[in-house]
Amino acid sequence: MTNIRKPPLLKIVNHSFIDLPAPSNISAWWNFGSLLGLCLVIQILTGLFLAMHYTSDTMTAFSSVTHICRDVNYGWLIRYMHANGASMFFICLFLHVGRGLYYGSYTYFETWNIGVILLFAVMATAFMGYVLPWGQMSFWGATVITNLLSAIPYIGTTLVEWIWGGFSVDKATLTRFFAFHFILPFIVAALVMVHLLFLHETGSNNPSGLISDSDKIPFHPYYTIKDALGIFLLLLLFMTLVLFFPDLLGDPDNYTPANPLNTPPHIKPEWYFLFAYAILRSIPNKLGGVLALIFSILILMMFPILHVSKQRSMMFRPLSQCLFWILVADLFTLTWIGGQPVEHPFITIGQVASIIYFVIILFALPIISMLENKLLKW
């Protein structure tokens, strides 16, 4: 057995997945890392097979997707696995980030910051992928979101036209989006390796937030079997979605070919961007909205700076727990608002929810943490 662990490549695998010392008390919330790895593999494989049949031309893109679904062997399955795989990816991502916030994993600066960059990269990939079927929502989503860059002073308009490759979203835009959508997942995979590299420098956090060096167990067989259960449950949920409700999370407008002369009644992105879209729409000023949109994700990088509690995890901090779950409820509210038309009362609800989002993170959590520090001495 020791001989198997000697070759350089196998040594890397061994140190990462077999003999890796892991805390003995990590819960099911630590399963999402491996599930995200599975989602990435599914997305790259299904995407590769879709790319074999897809054509990135405005005249034939929509038809090629139809051709994949109707004429290619199991093309419908590959297409729906890819579309719903993105949704599963983001569900796991949000839960993974939420776990990091709850248990204070953000104190591993490098791992956390690479993770936030990963989140941005995956969001960019998903956005460009949504444009490729060239349906109504693809076209108008691309137009609206890329047009936001025109809010940048001086260079905005030129930048947008440079990204479009013309004066509107057209053939050049679709071709370059396809090229970027193809290459980005491999960049994401490389970033994942860096993410794991930094994680294995420090070791995993655990629910208590305490140093667990005195109580480590080998990753295999304990966590390999635990991850296998997580993978089985994810695949069960995923294939139920793909085979029974493939269009549940999609937009019916995207079954209409893109038409620059006809605007859909409600332009909205995929469900996983709705919370950020609601924050964007809640600010009347264009540049302000764009900055709020970017900052709503970038604010994750501020968590290590804003952490003032003497305890790392929220496990023993009931007041912070309360705020955390209010934040989760607020994000659900923002997601709902993002999918609603821009009219009363949704505008006001969106503005209030956006303010609550930033207030909780920037002010409420640090203040409550300081109060809890005081209560420790009580």
UniProtKB/Swiss-Prot annotation:
Pfam families per UniProt: Cytochrom_B_C, Cytochrome_B
Binding site for a ubiquinone: H200
Cofactor: heme b
Gene3D superfamilies associated with the record: Cytochrome Bc1 Complex, Chain C (1.20.810.10)
SUPFAM superfamilies: a domain/subunit of cytochrome bc1 complex (Ubiquinol-cytochrome c reductase), Transmembrane di-heme cytochromes
Subcellular location: Mitochondrion inner membrane
Transmembrane annotation, as ranges: 32-52, 76-97, 112-132, 177-197, 225-245, 287-307, 319-339, 346-366
Main localization (coarse): mitochondrion
GO biological process, one term: mitochondrial electron transport, ubiquinol to cytochrome c
Protein's UniProt keywords contain Ligase: no
Source organism superkingdom: Eukaryota
GO MF annotations in UniProt: metal ion binding; ubiquinol-cytochrome-c reductase activity
Keywords: Electron transport, Heme, Iron, Membrane, Metal-binding, Mitochondrion, Mitochondrion inner membrane, Respiratory chain, Transmembrane, Transmembrane helix, Transport, Ubiquinone
Residues that coordinate or bind heme b b566: H96, H195
Annotated effect of mutating T240I: In strain: Isolate B9 and Isolate D1
GO CC annotation terms, alphabetical: mitochondrial inner membrane; respiratory chain complex III
Family according to the record: Belongs to the cytochrome b family.
Function text: Component of the ubiquinol-cytochrome c reductase complex (complex III or cytochrome b-c1 complex) that is part of the mitochondrial respiratory chain. The b-c1 complex mediates electron transfer from ubiquinol to cytochrome c. Contributes to the generation of a proton gradient across the mitochondrial membrane that is then used for ATP synthesis.
Name of the protein in its database record: Cytochrome b
